[in-house]
Amino acid sequence: MRIADSGDFIVDLARAGNRTKLNSKQIIIATPSSVASALVAPVSKELATLLDEIPYPPLSIVYLAYEKSAIKTPLDGFGFLVAPAEGLNILGCVWNSSLFDGRAPQGTALLTVFVGGARNPQAARLTDAELVSVAHSELQQALGIASEPQLIAITRYDRAIPQYNLGHAARVQKVESLLKEIPGLNLIGNYLHGVSTGDVIKEAERVAKEVAGLISSRP
């Protein structure tokens, strides 16, 4: 991506081996910050550096299914988070089959366990067997499970949730200040104004309305 003398953005695209160019007065980048960094680097090195420095620790997710009758704790709720003082490797657990219909057969509980993150990034890089062992044994401890899992699946994210570390608000302010110097360039992502899906949707709607208003006001 680069800016032409006219002020338009020129974007080089490659898809299925075919290359093409697009010209636009408005660009919305809705990617993780590291990807956005690479895209904006030709336009602003300073902005690219700010985006690239946002940390995303690794996270591994272990899905385990058990017979409900083997779980002593009633699964009446969302799940649980684990406080650091507990000394466990897992960060928390979501009770999928309690939250959503159709997630597991009758009489079966599907649980999602989170391992790693900023608190314990090395744990996210355990082998599959080690992850399952950790997740299962610590769920046994937390929920009183008296059986082996009937189903096991694992998903890994090398860069999971952006961290709002000390100084993040100042970083976002600087990012927004630099964007004002590049008219037409817009960023959306969970690294700016909230990590939840709701936060991102709210921000996306705001940016979309703003860009639509600018486009419709053009002569």
Q: Which residues fall in each region the model found?
A:
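Conserved flavin/dinucleotide-binding core of flavoenzymes
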Residues: 75-76, 92-219
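Mid-domain catalytic core of redox enzymes
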Residues: 2-111, 116-129, 137, 141-142, ...
